[in-house]
């Protein structure tokens, strides 16, 4: 997964740099891997604003203002929660683009 994240981060960096766009992230199961990959690119401060890691449902609610009822009804690993993570971090950080990652970090 790390290799793919790094490859996609380079593409993201080039696109955002050329268009002068600022990006922010909300991550769950990746635990900051996406943000780490982006900031490892030379010049990333030109495009990267911030990131939040909301691993638990409680933090998704407290930091990203996603109602626990919505999480409980749909599951943390759902399209609507990913959408809310992206939308709410975009508003929170006043960036141009946001990326959200949610999933299951299980043993398999």
Where do the protein language model's features map onto the residues?
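Short alpha-helical segments enriched in small residues
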Residues: 1-108
């Amino acid at each position: 997964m790390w290799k793919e994240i790094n490859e996609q981060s380079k593409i993201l960096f080039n696109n955002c740099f050329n268009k002068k766009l600022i990006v922010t992230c909300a991550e769950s199961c990746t635990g900051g891997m996406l943000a780490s990959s982006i900031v490892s690119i030379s010049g990333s401060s030109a495009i990267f604003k911030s990131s939040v890691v909301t691993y638990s449902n409680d933090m998704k609610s407290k930091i990203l203002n996603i109602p626990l009822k919505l999480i409980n009804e749909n599951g943390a690993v759902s399209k609507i929660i990913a959408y809310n993570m992206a939308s709410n971090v975009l508003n929170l950080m006043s960036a141009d683009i946001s990326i959200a990652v949610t999933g299951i970090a299980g043993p398999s």
